[in-house]
Amino acid sequence: MKTGYCIKTIKYKLRCSHPEWLTETEKYYRQVLDFYFRLLLEHEEIWELNLLQMQGALERLTIAGRDGRVPERPLPFDKVPVYFRRSAINKASASLKSYTEKYKNSGDDLVYTIPDTIDASVTYFKGMYKDFRENKISLKVWDGKKWNWMDCRLKGQSMPEDGMMLSPTVVFREKEFWLHVPVKQQTEDARNAKERMMSRENVCSVQFTNTDIFAMCCVLDGDGKQKAVYSCRGGDAYRSKCKVLLEKIEKSRVYTDKDNAPHANHKYYLRLKNLSEHYAHQVSREIVDFCVREEASVLVFPSYDKEFTKVVRYRSGMYSPLYLGSRIREFLKYKAWSTGIVVLELSAEGTSSKCFVCGGKIKKNGAMFECENGHQGSRFLNSARNLGVKCLKDFERKRKI
């Protein structure tokens, strides 16, 4: 069986004796990054190179060679460690490639503007950190005059035993410093969806709703027979908690609108954000655990056109279970892949208008439905079943072609 890998980011709260040094380091990093970004804009001939080749080209332009080569544009900074410099080069190159790809995909002519500075956090390559443990790390930081090794304390979840740590990033967010550590983990099953369907493995289809049920899940076997059903609940509780916070924001506006505060009601909006992330993580974990229990190796989401999605999200409200569906999808993709489950998106056309049992037209009545032949039940489960069957039929049809 093919194996693959997934990368997830673990976030640690960072505590240290000199937080101002972290600020100075970020400021210095942005200056170096800005220099290389502007240099890149002047040399379009290296834009098509890959990141490693771009790094070599930029270093030849700015760093003196061992053979006595004089650089064309010497780096205008003193005491820039090699891995600090390479981290800045890598981020500048990635920023430019992302920018050019955006225009290339849109078909528009490339018209770039030079930013005053690039809003980037410091990514620490090897050589800039050491002694990483679950509760501490040593970082090389700039105090404005010289480089120092600073011991920092970490608070967060433990590192997976089978995980390989990649280059961490120090991020300043919500008045605190955080260490974002990407972790690479191996997945036991890296087969694509086509290979899994040929093996007639179980499929789990998901229908998101705007009720107490965040998501209705249905597992079908290779023949389309229903094996298990699971509903992820908590939508009403989420909606109620959001409503309480929104009411507090509305009441406080009487006092905050007049004082011109730059971040009025920040603590309430932060709670809303944390609440949304909590439920999105909880529901996505429930769905993945259900798939593992029922041995479903393919997970299917409904896909809608952009205009329909925009209208539905607007009508349901920003803090509704259905609106949270997009965040749940986002978390599901990496959580599912880390356990060897493939995620697919399939057009939802026709899944909510016909009966799963007989294919007849249905009439909706709240959360229930009744078809023209008398079959009735949950309309969300009916949609999930139809989505799963549609997925199986699509792959069956492709095999025959």
Residue ranges and their predicted role:
Residues 1-91, 112:
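Gly/serine-rich nucleotide phosphate-binding loop at the start of the catalytic core
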Residues 1-3, 129-130, 169-172, 194-197, ...:
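A general structural signal for short secondary-structure junctions and capping/turn motifs
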Residues 3-9, 174-176, 201:
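A general secondary-structure signal for short beta-strands and their flanking turns/coil
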Residues 4-16, 146-154, 230-234:
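Generic detection of short hydrophobic beta-strand segments and adjacent strand-loop junctions
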Residues 40, 96-100, 291:
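Generic structural signal for hydrophobic core residues of well-folded globular domains
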Residues 179-401:
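Positively charged, helix-rich recognition surfaces that bind polyanionic ligands
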